[in-house]
Amino acid sequence: NGNGKPGKGKLSQRQIDIIRKKIEKQKEFLRGQIKKSKVTQSEQNQLSNIEQSGAELKVVGQTYTTRYGGTTKGIECVVVKKMTRSLMEQSNFPLTSQRYSSKPEEDTLYSQYENEVLEGIRIGTLLGKKLQVRGESRDTVFNRQLVGKLDKRMVSALGYGNEHVFFTKETDQFKKANLHISVDASGSMGGSKWKKTMMNIVALAKAVDMIPNLSIQISFRTTTNELPYVVIAYDSRTDKFMKVKQLFKYLTPGGTTPEGLCFEAIMKNMVGSTTDMDSYFLNISDGEPYFHGKDMNYSGDSAASHTYKMVKMIEGMGIKVLSYFVADGNYGEESSSGYTFKKSYGKAASFINVTNVNEVTRTMNKLFMEKA
């Protein structure tokens, strides 16, 4: 613009500087680098929200090799361990839209997916009823054994040279199971893909809530202020299902896809398999890993290789990985993104159309009903 003023829709240099200062201040909050000065009420609220949500910065991507063979110093990833309503109301939370001109009786956040959440609860209730057999156990007693516990009813037979007076008991029951769902919350997941995905993850959360030996965590990954961002929105071990019903309707996708960087950031929070627990990691996304931020260009084969390395580390914890590419029209398995997706997840990669996202729920239902 010739008059030195910013063009329509563009930020002035002063506005850019103000935004940069705000971003740096938020990073300092997360790192705990708070300067000793009078804290405003707004800053106090922000600090309180960060503390309640367990937010922290984790350095990730230090093993990432660029397409030219170079290495990076890594990048900080924002990890929010507990999503709260107050955090969602903050302007720097990347997955909600605020109503700035809301009346006192109106909601401060835009609720765009209430119908999908309610439908998910309906489907999940039906699924939960089918899965309730998981909470049952069946004892089978084998009588007249040579070893085992003494069968008191057979004691009198000892005098007649009968040594088959013992019994054994086998209990047939399902192992405990844990499911971590990681959802791609990038902008391209919007529209019908997000609606179908929301319906299915809510259905799984509702079903798990009805079964005593199942647990579930749901995390969303996106970007904020040139950093990867991952938030654990729901953890059935500590949260009540009402949280899903009340808060998930506000979640809206945006940003890019820092896949492997976010997996790396929350890996220590994942639940590994044990002798009495099966663990699953379910990824839902619609494209290849991509993130461009300060000092890092995370894309193409390099990002796919890093993501694959993280997937292998997750599998190394005894966790079964399932990864679904939600395709839209012709943009699927045969596309360049489909190729990169396969490279990122290997044998764990599956392709589904936006019209049959319910396949995710059916697959988990089948896995939950398997016995070791």
Where are these regions (language model features)?
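Negatively charged
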Residues: N1-L179, S192, K243
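Extended acidic, low-complexity intrinsically disordered regions
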Residues: N1-N3, K8-L11, K27, G190, ...
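Von Willebrand factor
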Residues: T171-I284, G316, L322-G332, E359, ...
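Short, contiguous acidic/charged loop-to-helix segments that flank catalytic cores in large enzymes
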Residues: S188-K195, F248-P258, N269-G272, Y290-S305, ...
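Secondary-structure transition/capping motifs at alpha-helix termini
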Residues: K206-S215, V271-M277, M313-M317
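VWA/integrin I-like adhesion module and closely mimicked acidic/polar interface patches used
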Residues: M267, G287-S344
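C-terminal helix of von Willebrand factor
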Residues: K343-A372
